[in-house]
A protein has these predicted regions:
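Catalytic-core signal marking the mid-to-C-terminal active-site face
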Residues: 3-7, 12-15, 22, 250, ...
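Phosphate/diphosphate-binding glycine-rich loops and adjacent basic-rich segments that engage nucleotide
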Residues: 148-220
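N-terminal glycine-rich anion-binding loops that anchor highly charged ligand groups
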Residues: 5-11, 25-51, 65-76, 266-269, ...
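Secondary-shell segments that build the walls of catalytic and ion/ligand-binding clefts
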Residues: 196-258
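A generic, well-ordered mixed alpha/beta core segment in the N-terminal half of proteins
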Residues: 80-172
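Active-site cofactor/substrate anionic-group-binding motifs, chiefly glycine-
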Residues: 48-102
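N-terminal nucleophile
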Residues: 157-160, 167, 182, 238-270
Length: 361
């Protein structure tokens, strides 16, 4: 496959679903995982898209990822619930967690959902969008257990994960306002994408094993490993620390320290604490009008007419629209790794080649 090739999203979805069916996932599980990964690529976040498949296959083969498992209720009290993800596909248990939280928010006006011990839950904005589609605000604090990748402010090595923070606000007859980012300067997956492409990352994102700043993504992919830096120095570090506590400790899960370190970088375990709010719970009849007035006010001051001001989440909306028409781009290195993973789990070569022909057409 040539670099820069674009794949039809629907055909690619069928292939990804077939990969997980080959791995042993039941039909609904394979669909939910494929839905999520393709949606991440369509939204422009390739770091959380189908490029994760080789890591998932390795995690499963090492006994970390548990297929065909579901979230288990640990404690439930009114509007609050704590769930054990049972090391299942995060794309499954997070979907179940958000569905339960939405149900509680309909009933109580507000819900708090704590999920721990889940395998990688992917792009957090996807779960916020699930809440927004139901008309709800949601706030998400996420931690990554036992795989330190990010150095604290003034730190010399990695001490915690990329710990995403996410907020969504639904809008009437318009796309939701969505804030979703890792508290590291860039997501770990973006170093993987850059490494496969053979390109540097922006300055201010990485340090090498000696703590020296670098733009070489190999320091996050090849030993000896360096570390990501937090965004905005002490501000990103402080938010990352709160995500570690609210996402990890408060959810009933673990925080990252000497006793919780994982032996495999593919054993990605997430914890997430989510607050889901029905905006009608508040006495704010003018809320939508005020939101739109602010949006119009902000967008009306571009410095350059060729670079319009985007609202939070608008970049994803635009990228999704473009990729649905033009296809999902994938570099040759990532595609080769996905095909190798498919072979590793026993997908027949003729089946793989048949999909390749469909995708190339």
């Amino acid at each position: 496959m040539e670099s820069g090739h674009r794949f039809d999203a629907q055909t690619l979805h069928s292939f990804i679903q077939a990969v997980f069916r080959q791995m042993g996932s039941e039909e609904q599980e394979a669909k939910l995982v494929a839905d999520h990964l393709i949606a991440a690529n369509l939204a422009g976040h390739d770091s959380h898209g189908i490029g994760m498949i080789p890591s998932y296959v390795r995690s499963w083969s090492q006994g970390h990822l548990q297929i065909n498992h579901h979230a288990k209720t640990v404690k439930e009290s009114g509007a609050a619930v704590t769930l054990d993800g049972d090391r299942a596909f995060g794309q499954v248990v997070a979907h179940e967690a958000m569905a339960l939280g939405i149900e509680k928010a309909h009933k109580h006006g507000i819900a708090a959902v704590a999920l721990h011990n889940s395998h990688h839950i992917g792009r957090i904005g996807y779960w916020a969008e699930q809440c927004a589609a139901a008309g709800f605000v949601s706030i998400h604090f996420v931690s990554v257990v036992g795989i330190p990748m990010v150095a604290p402010f003034h730190g010399r090595d990695s001490r915690f994960g990329t710990n995403p923070f996410c907020v969504v606000f639904p809008r009437k007859d318009n796309f939701p306002l969505l804030l979703d980012y890792a508290t590291s300067a860039i997501a770990f997956g973006k170093t993987r994408v850059a490494w496969h492409k053979g390109v540097p990352v922006p300055p201010g994102c990485l340090i090498d094993v000696n703590g020296v700043p670098t733009t070489n993504p190999a320091v996050m992919q090849e030993s000896p490993l360096g570390a990501l830096l937090t965004f905005a120095e002490h501000k990103g570090y402080a938010l990352a620390a709160m995500c570690e506590i609210l996402g990890g400790a408060l959810s009933g899960g673990k925080t990252t320290h000497q006793e919780t370190l994982q032996t495999s970088p593919d054993a990605i375990l997430n914890c997430m604490t989510t607050i889901i709010i029905n905006p009608e719970l508040f006495g704010a009849p003018d809320c939508n009008a005020q939101t739109e007035a602010f949006a119009e006010w902000v967008k009306a001051s571009p410095h350059d007419d060729d670079k319009p001001i985007l609202l939070p989440g608008e970049w994803e909306v635009n990228t999704r629209r473009e990729r649905q028409k033009q296809g999902i781009p994938l570099d040759a290195g990532s595609w080769q790794a996905i095909c190798d993973a498919a072979r590793q789990i026993g997908m027949p070569e003729e089946t793989l080649q048949a999909f390749c022909q469909q995708l190339a057409s």
